[in-house]
Design a protein with these regions (language model features):
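A general "terminal functional-core" signal
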Residues: 4, 51-327
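Low-complexity, intrinsically disordered regions enriched in charged/polar residues
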Residues: 9, 34, 42, 46, ...
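Short glycine-centered helix-capping/turn motifs at secondary-structure transition points
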Residues: 19-25, 47, 94, 135
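Charged, often glycine-rich, active-site loop that binds/positions anionic groups
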Residues: 33-57
Length: 327
């Protein structure tokens, strides 16, 4: 996508400038590498990989109504996925405690054989598969707080129990998946948890979901690594959304995940950038996440209050999830 598309290069450029101007020396950079085609093929079909590879050097190829390639899309998508894998290695090898991959294009909408919603390769799904196949982990938790449901990630692991997918997302909204009843299939039944929320939810609403649903589920699942599809389009003022999460809210969500990780997987948390199209909101949200990742001890989390509206919306989630988990 080009400079006038909401998913533009300026998204990562503004983050790079923020790191250079406000956080120089605070964090250890991890150099990206291109993911191999074999790594991409864990999630995506070979024919689709070859098709996307054939777009290299071409000015523009439209893949759906809002997703098109540029001359370097294939190369950049490989670097986004491979950069996330390098971040996972850096954590597991003890070089860093946790990480956030500030990459584009995003990935959680990408299906096995289809680009969707600005996404080409599913970075977080490839990361989870890498942890299982290459690093020998048995339980990986994916938390997706993006505005939109991660249809591609859900479908990648829908029949599996070694990867638990947990999503909060606004409804009704693109892509139309992510109902509470979509809980997995076969051995994966109960390992796909969707929490759809209507517009207007803010810091306390999301923190309540994390504290009252995600945390007890994670305590029972006992993940060995937590991956996060970090969408900053839930931030107040995002042009594609209607959520009201502020800078502090992104920090509290991060603290909540770090608290879960301390109990089950010695702090292993890796975030990968998904959405977020209001540049000031994106920059401020990422800055707060980085600040929380850098703390040795975040301290106790607040006990959030929840509105009657949110409580009613969550009732189907509690009923459905109790078939598989103690809540």
């Amino acid at each position: 996508m080009g400079p006038f598309h909401v998913e533009s290069p300026e998204r990562v450029l503004v983050l790079n400038r923020m790191l250079e101007e406000e956080a120089a020396g605070e964090f250890l950079p991890v150099e990206p590498r291109p993911a191999t085609e074999a790594e991409i093929a864990w999630i995506h079909e070979r024919g689709y990989i070859d098709f996307l590879k054939a777009t290299a050097g071409r000015t523009s190829v439209f893949l759906d109504g809002d997703t098109s390639t540029g001359p370097r899309t294939y190369e950049t998508a490989l670097l986004a996925a491979g950069g996330f894998l390098n971040a996972l290695d850096a954590i597991l090898d003890g070089r860093v405690r946790n990480a956030i991959a500030l990459v584009r294009p995003p990935g959680h909408h990408a299906e096995a054989s289809q680009a969707m919603g600005f996404c080409f390769f599913n970075n977080v799904a490839i990361g989870a598969e890498y942890l299982v196949r290459r690093r020998g982990l048995r339980r990986v938790l994916i938390v997706d707080w993006d505005l939109h449901h991660g249809n591609g990630t859900q479908h990648a692991f829908y029949s599996r129990r070694d990867v638990l997918y947990f999503s909060t997302h606004q409804v009704p909204l693109y892509p139309g998946t992510g109902a509470t009843r979509e809980t997995g299939d076969g051995p994966g039944k109960g390992y796909n948890l969707n929490v759809p929320l209507t517009a207007g939810k803010g810091d306390e609403d999301l923190l309540y979901v994390f504290r009252k649903i995600l945390s007890p589920v994670a305590a029972q699942f006992k993940p060995e690594f937590i991956l996060v599809s970090a969408g900053f389009d839930i931030g107040r003022g995002d042009p594609l959304g209607g959520m009201l999460v502020d800078r502090e809210g992104f920090g509290l969500l991060t603290d909540s995940l770090l608290a879960i990780a301390r109990l089950s997987c010695p702090g292993r948390v890796a975030l990968v950038l998904e959405g977020g199209y209001d540049l000031p909101t994106l920059k401020n949200g990422v800055r707060e996440v980085l600040a929380r990742l850098g703390r040795e001890d975040p301290g106790p989390l607040p006990d959030p209050a929840v509105s009657a509206v949110t409580a009613r919306e969550l009732e189907p989630c509690f009923r459905t999830f109790r078939d598989s988990w103690e809540l």
